[in-house]
Amino acid sequence: MKPNRILPLVLVLACSIAVARGTYQEPEDFLADTFGTEPPSPGVVWLRGETRETSKAILGHKYPSLRIRYWGNAERSAWILEEIGKEQPITVGLVVSNGRIERIKVLAFRESRGWEVRHPFFTDQFRDIGLTGERGLDRDIDGISGATLSVRALKKLARLALYLHTRIPATDDTP
């Protein structure tokens, strides 16, 4: 193949990889979509003791901070969490309502592969999913060929958000 024919092909490939990476929604916009124009004040779940150990078991490693912010209350909460796909973090917004996933959305994706997890055909599988007694998801999630690590990251974050939702104090009266 002549070099002048290869260049357009390389440019198209490079552009498609660049389009896969990016910020799809800002966290503030995700919270506004979830709660309306004025999201509730954030609360904090501290990762200490059993909470820290369970979070570590769910993720397979320690969460990078000692506390995780949430918005909402013990009935309905929103979480913005990150997990590494293959090499880069994936930022995900999750809404938990009465112990079930209400909504999951990829807010930012930084990997060159696996970006398909951001599409509704994949994320809709998480709707109304909960935790089993062993803190696994109570329903199977179909994978995406070539996106195994991204799929795994979203499944871990769904499990983590569902678990952390149970750690919100029942007396928290944040709207």
Q: What would you call each of these model-derived segments?
A:
Residues P8-S16:
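Bacterial N-terminal signal peptides
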